[in-house]
Amino acid sequence: MSFLKDLEEKGYCIIDNVLSQEEVEISLNSFHEWFNSYSQIKESHNKVSPHGIFKFFEVGHQRHAWFIRTRPAVLDVFKELWKTDELVVSFDGSCYIPKDLMKKDNIWTHADQAPSKKGLMCYQGFVSLTENKERTFVVYEGSHKLHEIYCEEKKLTDNKNWLLIDHDYLDKIKDTKRVLHVKAGSLVIWDSRTFHQNQYGTLPEDRIVQYISFLPKKQRTSKMFEKRFKYFTEKRTTSHWAYPVKVNGLQPQTYGNKDLLIDYSKLVPPKLDDLKEDIIKLI
């Protein structure tokens, strides 16, 4: 399949029409229903969510997230990637940048694989519910092949799965920078070694995506399962790594503003009963 070749050569791929138009509309409706279900979600989003990325408010376990994760076409792509029908999924968050929010872009290009990890370890991605030409995903083509070289050059050896890339290094590879045109219903996947970031751009576009990542179940230990099941029942949001699990905190950085503290007792529980059978298979 062409997307496998793209991932190997470019470090990323775009697969159009993974969700049907109907599935996109269902997901959008679910997202907006959740977003408007509690006033603090909307009021605090741009204050506590860097680059529009939701990490709080139990976002990783809302209906739109689980609906997308359990779509057969989404699963089929990752089954093909990992050559197995047995997968586990991350409890990752979403990104929402409304079209009326305009910000100056900063360079925060990074890789999500630690210097201590060599070779292909994880594919991460998102399903887009909006079409975006400029308020979108930025990637450096082929940079997954530079990850180990960069870490050796900078003498980096730590095991944190978040690696900020120096601006001077990015300038050397600027010709490989790609600003992706992503259509609604598309699945974007990248090797976790690939250098990437979001950008606001200059066009007033809504951007809504659900981050998504699967790993083979065969490497999930019983201890990992216990931890994952615990975080599922507690509706905790995690990083894009399905394992080892890295859970996000419950509260954002408030800088002394108590109004930003989240009252989880006021959140509306997601309705997942019709998806439960498929969800359990992915934990």
Where are these regions (language model features)?
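Non-heme Fe(II)/2-oxoglutarate
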Residues: 40-44, 193-283
